Swiss-Prot record:
This is Small ribosomal subunit protein uS11c. It comes from the Eukaryota. Keywords: Chloroplast, Plastid, Ribonucleoprotein, Ribosomal protein, RNA-binding, rRNA-binding. InterPro entries: Ribosomal_uS11, Ribosomal_uS11_bac-type, Ribosomal_uS11_CS, Ribosomal_uS11_sf. Transmembrane segments: none annotated. GO terms for cellular component: chloroplast; ribonucleoprotein complex; ribosome. GO terms for biological process: translation. Pfam families: Ribosomal_S11 (PF00411). Belongs to the universal ribosomal protein uS11 family. Part of the 30S ribosomal subunit. One of its GO terms (molecular function) is rRNA binding. The gene is rps11. It is found in: Plastid, Chloroplast. It comes from Cycas taitungensis (Prince sago).
Length: 130
């Protein structure tokens, strides 16, 4: 006798998240926005490439703004009211992504820059000659 097949619904929409952490990783080529709960479980994510920007358009500030808005739109449906923001990377989309997060209506407890800074670690890549 086979077991009855259980129907697995979408658990993503069931969860209510009052507080979360928004991680913005802004590299020179792309901007990735990940939203987690306070334990670190990923709730939603978006990137400039996933929003439809390809090639050099991914590194623009407008692409970062679109990625931040897409990531936050899903968590607003899940009831997130407060958030912390962790920004890392030197990319051109970091300020625009933060501006889009501020405009979204989520109360921000703090904004922290977590860009890794070497204490004279690895040698940096050579300068480009264009």
């Amino acid at each position: 006798m086979s077991k009855p097949i259980r129907k697995i619904g979408s658990r993503r929409n069931e969860r209510r998240i009052p507080k979360g952490v928004i991680h913005v990783q802004a590299s020179f080529n792309n901007t990735i926005v990940t939203v987690t709960d306070v334990r670190g479980q990923v709730v939603s994510w978006s990137s400039a490439g996933a929003c439809g920007f390809k090639g050099t358009k991914r590194s623009t500030p407008f692409a970062a703004q679109t990625a931040a808005e897409n990531a936050i739109r899903t968590l607003m449906d899940q009831g997130m009211e407060r958030a912390e923001v962790m920004i890392s990377g030197p990319g051109p989309g970091r300020d625009t992504a933060l501006r889009a997060i501020r405009r979204s209506g989520v109360l921000l407890s703090f904004v922290r820059d977590v860009t890794p800074m070497p204490h004279n670690g690895c040698r940096p890549p050579k300068k480009r000659r264009v």
